[in-house]
Structures are given as structure tokens and as C-alpha cells.
Amino acid sequence: MNASDTIAAVATAVAPGQGGIAVVRVSGPAAEATGRSVVHCPGRQVCGSHRVMYGHVIDGEGRRLDEVLLLLMRGPRSFTGEDVVEIHCHGGVVAVQQVLERVLAHPGVRRALPGEFSQRAVLNGRLDLTRAEAVSELVAARSRRAAELAMAGLDGGIQAKITALRERLLDQLTELEARVDFEEDLPPLDGDALLDGLQQVRQALLTLVADGERADALRSGLRVALVGRPNVGKSSLLNRLSRRERAIVTELPGTTRDLLESEIVLEGVPITLLDTAGIRSTDDAVEQLGIARSEEALATADVVLLVLDGHAGWTAEDAALLARIPEHIPRILVANKADLPAGALPQPVDVQLSALEGTGEEDLVQALLERCGAAGTEGVLLALNERQRDLAATAAAALGRSQEVAAQQLPWDFWTIDLREAIRALGEITGEELTEAVLDRVFSRFCIGK
């Protein structure tokens, strides 16, 4: 990446052709000249910073391609810290493509790489690394709770917390290094108090890691497969949970011949429900295809709901289906049709409910969230992503080693080795310790235009 280039991309999340307006963003030294060249603004409009101008995008022969608004933001008062131009055009596929092509045709302008706008914002001091990541997470949020946690990061919550912990460690390092160089001139250092301070930071980091792991489901969501023999009520349960008729519900076994999906949100956790075809032996070619897809869903699910007919009781088919579920995938045994007289269920079940009447639904929701480790996320205030958690765990491990050094009563300079490692890891979270490898890892996951 050459930071002196001028870059351009479509910045809006809505796919071309699906929104009334699209935004083409341009950033870099040639941004203003590009905007003035591509957009013709009639009358006596003043092309000033942070002012909106009206005009038309024109081609090389002077023909109008689209009616647009032009917004100029001169650096450093822009998202990237550079001169930025935004062209607000119509959202049709042709309109967006023509505007972007005209921009890219300007000398010195190239197409932006994934995440390059945000990367420039970090390099120019407009964002720290945690805020840049929060931008991506806010765009990708699939639930209000996920958006809340992303916004907490965008507001600087993670950066402030990590910076405060890092500064405490820097203070401790300063004390230790002073003792290494000038121990005879300074009063004795209270080693127990120092260890207590390091342990407080370590515990705070472990709490952040645990909270981030619990909140992971809010970001990525869960795939939940509903599995069971035909006519046990899987489709009725899908319709009950999704609050809309997604599956045809009849008394005929094998009605669901394909894999049906429904997107829902339970207590802030995005969940994809997969209503599988009843897995059984059949000569029907279409049903066989649905069963094959069901088995694929079974292997890739985060959790499996094995739906039983609580009225008919436990059968050999139920036992065979239970054996098909991979050992590493959590499973919940759900006895449906609790509104009817109960049959024999020698196999202990986790939840009894009636998909028809809705009884037991809350028990199922809680069992699902607990089995996936997603329960209790309402208490999470800051959610570190995987990269941030790895670094926080590295820092916590380094601080744990410092306790071992203390137990061995080694000299102060031995303490500084692990302390420096913890400080480096925390600095990498926020971007205080910034390398090209860190930037590549973070921004390669971004979409073009962010």
C-alpha cells in the first residue's frame, strides 16, 4: 500500500440497484482535483471544505451521467485525515459504476484496497486500532446488542480500558528500571504491593477475555439445526421460534424435503435456524437430496436440537439420530407435543414443550444460550474481538510469569522481561505498537470502501 496514492471506492453498504443513493468516496492528495474534474457544479457555488454542492457527473465528452451532490472535506478534518471527496449519486448499478469509472479515470487515482480508508485513518491518528475495528463490527452487526457493543468500542471504551491498564504497567516498569539502575539511592521497593498491582491488571485482562468470548456469539451468530424423525414437529417449532410461517406444516411425514433457514435474534444473539428434512430411509429421490443436505447441516451446526415426539415416546429412530450427531457438537433433546399425553421417554430430555401452544419456549431459549456459552451477555460492557483477546491473553500470561519470577526471588531486572512483553501486547491492541503485519491482519478483513 502506498499512502501517498489517491484512492476511491463505493462506500455505501447497500448493494448497487437496491438503494436510492450510493456514495463514492475519494481520499488522498488528488481528491479535491478529482471531485472538481468529475462533477460540474453550475452557478456560483463555492467549493469550500465541509460544504455540499449540487451538480452533475460528466463524461469526457461533456455528457451528463448522473445528478449528484459533492461534499469536500479537507484534511485533517476528515475520516482519513486526508483530503476527502464524497460523491452522492443515485444507487442504480449503472449510475454507480459510471461515477466510479469517471473517478478512477482521473490521473493518480486507484481503486482502494479492503479497509484502506480506515487504515489511513489509523496511520494519520484519526482513529486508534480498536475504533477502526469497531467501525467494521458496527457495519457487520446482526442484532441491536451487537451494535451496542460495537458502538462502545467506537466510542473509545476498549481503547480507554486497555490504555489505562497499560499505563499502570508502564508505571511499574519505571519503578523496576529505576531500582535496577539506582537501587542504592532509592528506598526499598515493596515487592508485595508491586505483585498485587500486577495481579489486579492480570485479573482485569482475564475478565475482558472472558467477556469477549461470551459475546462472540453476538458477532458471529449461531447455526442451530433442528433434527428429528418425520412429523415430530420440527417445522412447527421453527415457525414458533421465527414467529412466521416459514415451513409447511401438515400431518404427512416427509413434508419438509429441503433445508429451510430462518434468521432470528434471541436475547441479542443472531441465530440461523436450520429446519432439516426428516432423516430416514426413503426411495424418493427428492427427499433423499433433502436428507443429504440435512446431514451436511448437522455436521456444521453450532448446536443441534434433537426434536422428539413426546406423545409417541422414545424410538429406535430417535436413538439412531442421536448417534449421528458428532460428539463435539452440543445437543439439546427437546420433547415436543407436551400438550398431549406423554409417552415413555427413557432417554432424559432437556426441554419439554408444545410448539403448537408455545409452552416451554422460554426454557428452550435459555437452554440453547447456555449450551452455546452465550447466556449472560447482557452484563458485558466491552467485547474484545479475537485479535484483541489473543493479545490480552498474551499480556495476562506474561504477568502470570512475573509472579513465578517473584516466587523465585530473582533480581528486579528479571521482572522487567515479562512486564515489557505485557506492555507490548497491550500496545498492539490499540496500535501503540504498530507494525505492517498488524495492519495487514486487521484491515484485510474489512470490506472495500471502509
UniProtKB/Swiss-Prot annotation:
(6S)-5-formyl-5,6,7,8-tetrahydrofolate binds at residues 25, 86, 126, 450. It comes from Parasynechococcus marenigrum (strain WH8102). GTP binds at residues 231-236, 250-256, 275-278, 336-339. It is an enzyme of class 3 (hydrolase). One of its GO terms (biological process) is tRNA wobble uridine modification. NCBIfam families: mnmE_trmE_thdF, small_GTP. Keywords: Cytoplasm, GTP-binding, Hydrolase, Magnesium, Metal-binding, Nucleotide-binding, Potassium, tRNA processing. Its EC number is 3.6.-.-. Residues 221-373 form the TrmE-type G domain. Its main location: cytoplasm. Its cofactor is K(+). Binds 1 potassium ion per subunit. This is tRNA modification GTPase MnmE. CDD domains: trmE (cd04164), TrmE_N (cd14858). Belongs to the TRAFAC class TrmE-Era-EngA-EngB-Septin-like GTPase superfamily. TrmE GTPase family. GO terms for molecular function: GTP binding; GTPase activity; metal ion binding. K(+) binds at residues 231, 250, 252, 255. Mg(2+) binds at residues 235, 256. Exhibits a very high intrinsic GTPase hydrolysis rate. Involved in the addition of a carboxymethylaminomethyl (cmnm) group at the wobble position (U34) of certain tRNAs, forming tRNA-cmnm(5)s(2)U34. It is found in: Cytoplasm. Disulfide bonds: none annotated. Pfam families: MMR_HSR1, MnmE_helical, TrmE_N. GO terms for cellular component: cytosol.
